[in-house]
Amino acid sequence: MEKFPAVTVFDLDYQGRGVAKIDGQVVFIEGALPDETVTFCKTSAKKQFIEAVVDEIIEPSPQRVAPRCPFYDRCGGCALQHWHSQEQLLGKQKLWLTQLQRLGGAQPEHVLLPLAGKEWRYRRRARLAVHYENDVIAVGFKAKRSHDVVAVNDCLILQEHLAAALPLLPDFLRALLPVKVDEILLTAGEKVAALTLRTKKRALSPAWGEKWANLAGAHWQLWENDRCLFGEPNDLYYQPISGVTLHFTPDDFIQVNASVNEALIQTVLAWLAPLEKSEVLDLFSGLGNFSLPLAYKGARVTAVEGVRAMVQRGAKMAAEQQLSSRLEMQCMDLFSVSAAQMKSWQSAKSWLLDPPRAGAHAVVQALPKKFPEKIVYVSCNPATLARDVAILQSKGFHLERGQVVNMFAHSAHIESVILMTRTI
């Protein structure tokens, strides 16, 4: 790789890379922090910028720390372990506010302190790569800037009982041969954990589940693709709030950080208060991470989700927990919303949006200028959030408050939540 002379880093980008300039050209430098002087090696060159990796740190930032993970230099799983955890939070908040202002022309009236939880051993879900070469089976994560697999026997951001499975997997996969596994999912509920093996066809017998449980512990399930081979599927659940149980499968989307998710739910409940007998519309509701707690707290909730299987299972959970009278589940495509559909939701004065990374563009574009009165928006992408906030401001909404949610400690991903209230 081509080496370049020293530059001073003046910012951080949304991928956690240091930003510098050389001869007027922007350079994104993996592994560099703001205010550091570094030399770098070019990894790729575009017309308007250079991508690079740190070669030598000449003047380190006082915020730099030694990464805890022995695989950090090679593994692509974490991006920010070399940055003090408190500074990570402040840096994410700064980047989030910059995105809101630059892309959305918006600034929250009240910027709350970041919502944070455990920094280590917090992830209850992980996707593992597998590579077979001769007699060696590598199980781990994709390498930085590569599709190579970095074999790991621990992961410091995984919950302990999930991480404990890592050193057991290569030998277990070797025993499965000639069946080969393309990918592995590790998922933790409150009672059991699940090992999911992605194979090209259903090739495994339930006996392998018992063998895995004998190896890893009785609290494990074994799944092959979407089929539970060992254990009771209904045992895989979490409680978003006390009194509410949400059952899920390994393929379902759930927030990876249990403690931060619980804190986020409490924030959403507080911002949508008063809830007793109020009407709330929950868009992009998934299995009911927010809508089940909202109904439990007394709100009348209409929850809308695009995946029919999730809607059906959410409705089943509502019925099992005697919440059906306060929770209606609807299935529709929220990336194409009609005026007639909007009108059918007008009785709900409070709306909750929790879209995927693409944001809620179709919803906010179709929003009339009469309702709702307030919107709580949970975002996993500052760029699409800023775009949607700009549209909402043009329709009479005020960005009252917001905060970064540190759902993904040591990664560059930014989760956030905002409250917008109608002013006209």
From Swiss-Prot:
Keywords: 4Fe-4S, Iron, Iron-sulfur, Metal-binding, Methyltransferase, rRNA processing, S-adenosyl-L-methionine, Transferase
Secreted as UniProt keyword: no
List of residues binding S-adenosyl-L-methionine: Q255, F284, N289, E305, D333, D354
Domain TRAM stretches: 1-56
EC number, as in UniProt: 2.1.1.190
Family: Belongs to the class I-like SAM-binding methyltransferase superfamily. RNA M5U methyltransferase family. RlmD subfamily.
UniProt feature coiled coil, ranges: none
Residues reported in the UniProt entry to bind [4Fe-4S] cluster: C69, C75, C78, C155
Signal peptide (from-to): none
InterPro entries, per database record: 23S_rRNA_MeTrfase_RlmD, MeTrfase_TrmA_AS, NA-bd_OB-fold, SAM-dependent_MTases_sf, TRAM_dom, U5_MeTrfase_fam
Substrates-to-products reaction catalysed: uridine(1939) in 23S rRNA + S-adenosyl-L-methionine = 5-methyluridine(1939) in 23S rRNA + S-adenosyl-L-homocysteine + H(+)
PANTHER family listed in its UniProt record: 23S RRNA (URACIL(1939)-C(5))-METHYLTRANSFERASE RLMD, RNA M5U METHYLTRANSFERASE
Highest taxon above the source species: Bacteria
GO biological process per UniProt: rRNA base methylation
Pfam families assigned to the protein according to its UniProt record, in alphabetical order: TRAM, tRNA_U5-meth_tr
Active site: residue positions: C380 (nucleophile)
Role of this protein: Catalyzes the formation of 5-methyl-uridine at position 1939 (m5U1939) in 23S rRNA.
Alphabetized Gene3D superfamilies for the sequence: 2.40.50.1070, Nucleic acid-binding proteins (2.40.50.140), Vaccinia Virus protein VP39 (3.40.50.150)
Upper taxonomic lineage: Bacteria, Pseudomonadati, Pseudomonadota, Gammaproteobacteria, Cardiobacteriales
GO molecular function, one term: rRNA (uridine-C5-)-methyltransferase activity
Record has Cytoplasm as a keyword: no
Name listed for the protein in its UniProt record: 23S rRNA (uracil(1939)-C(5))-methyltransferase RlmD
